[in-house]
Design a protein with these regions (language model features):
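Outer-membrane beta-barrel pore domains and translocons
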Residues: 1, 45-47, 109, 120-122, ...
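Outer membrane beta-barrel
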Residues: 1-65, 96-114, 163, 171-173, ...
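Short, solvent-exposed loop/turn and secondary-structure capping segments
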Residues: 6, 53-55, 128, 186, ...
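Residues on the lipid-exposed face of transmembrane beta-strands in outer-membrane beta-barrel proteins
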Residues: 28-32, 104-108, 157-163, 209-215, ...
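Conformationally flexible catalytic loops at phosphate/diphosphate-handling active centers
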Residues: 61-81, 85-88
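Detector for outer-membrane/organellar transmembrane beta-barrel domains
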Residues: 110-282
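Predominantly the C-terminal beta-signal and adjacent terminal strand-loop region
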Residues: 291-335
Length: 335
């Protein structure tokens, strides 16, 4: 809970491990020690939303991403504001959040191990335009109607432990998070929300977990192994022959594993929607000090990582990817 004292994975990969719960963002935090070995904290944190939703047409299921400004049930939905492209904006998309994320945490140090439990509350907002006459038309600037803001409340609970299995030689670390609208707080960045039938942002239920072992065979050598998983549930609906949401079984995945002209252009074909369902990760590595003295410390590290992505089942199956990654690093710490 103390700033810069976080228990983060020792990986070279700066995005750490799938299943690790963290985010890089500004915050205002207050912490109080209520008793020996017991601390309570609360923070207000910079909000942002990870939206993932698709739309397609039955029976073939071809389509693509549902974008801000799209039409649902004859209404225009806006959940992203795009910068004007000047100064530091450069067309960056900013989600329309109206309140900070709130996190509460309790930390316990009873004498053996360190334990934490936390709660998370989030407020997802978008804007919906209902046209006065007939259905709205995407991209039109002459629509007349009534607009309103819709806010959806998300929440999650989680915890973590750090246990000295063999003091000074072997430690166990683990963490987990479960909730609705909590995907952004996992290293894999699965979605928080998708599109709802009324144009609101509909919560995506999900969970994440990670566990690891850290060994110190001798002074100056750290060896680690971690495994993690993140998963979300489907959330979808249909309006006639138009399909919406996340993980809709009517979406087509038919050509995800087929090379097409789109492949060479860096595009995704209309019959490969492949919404992410689950990410898994296994990694091992080490850090060895090669110099430690009056001028600081030099360490050499290496890491192997296996990452698997699994998509929701659609027309044509549930495609997946398997990535094997090797990292090496030399780091100098002057202090």
């Amino acid at each position: 809970m103390t700033p810069r004292k976080e228990n983060i994975p020792l990986t070279i990969d700066a995005n750490y491990v799938v299943g690790f719960n963290y985010i890089r963002q500004w915050q205002i935090r207050g912490v109080v020690d209520v008793a020996p070995g017991i601390s309570l904290g609360a923070s207000a944190e910079n909000p942002a939303t990870i939206f993932l939703g698709s739309t397609a047409t039955a029976p073939l299921g071809t389509g693509g991403a549902f974008a801000s400004g799209g039409i649902v049930n004859g209404q225009v939905v806006n959940f992203v504001n795009t910068g004007g492209g000047g100064d530091f904006l450069q067309g960056v998309n900013v989600t329309t959040d109206q309140a900070p994320d709130i996190i509460e945490k309790a930390a316990f140090d009873p004498g053996w191990g360190h334990y934490e439990v936390f709660g998370l509350q989030r407020f997802f907002s978008d804007n919906v335009l209902r046209c006065a006459v007939g259905a709205c038309v995407a991209g039109s600037t002459t629509m007349v109607g009534t607009a309103d803001n819709k806010t959806t409340f998300g929440a999650g609970v989680g915890g973590s432990v750090l246990l000295p299995l063999i003091p000074k030689y072997l430690e166990l670390t683990a963490n987990g998070l479960y909730g609705r609208g909590v995907g952004r707080y996992g290293a894999g960045q699965l979605p928080d929300v998708t599109i709802g039938v009324d144009g609101s942002l509909s919560l995506v239920r999900g969970w994440s977990a990670m566990a690891g072992l850290i060994a110190h065979p001798w002074e100056g050598l750290d060896v680690y192994a971690y495994a993690g998983v993140e998963q979300v549930d489907s959330n979808f609906f249909n309006v006639g022959t138009t399909l919406f949401g996340l993980g809709n079984p009517g979406f087509s995945n038919a050509t995800c594993l087929v090379t097409t002209p789109f492949s060479f252009a860096g595009n995704t074909p209309a019959d490969c929607i492949a919404n992410n369902k689950r990410l898994t990760d296994v990694t091992v590595g080490f850090w060895q000090n090669v110099y430690k003295g009056d001028y600081g410390r030099v360490a050499f590290g290496a890491q192997y990582e296996y990452i698997k992505r699994k998509a929701f089942v659609g027309i044509g199956g549930d495609p997946s990817t398997d990535d094997n990654v090797v990292f090496t690093s030399v780091r100098y710490y002057p202090f």
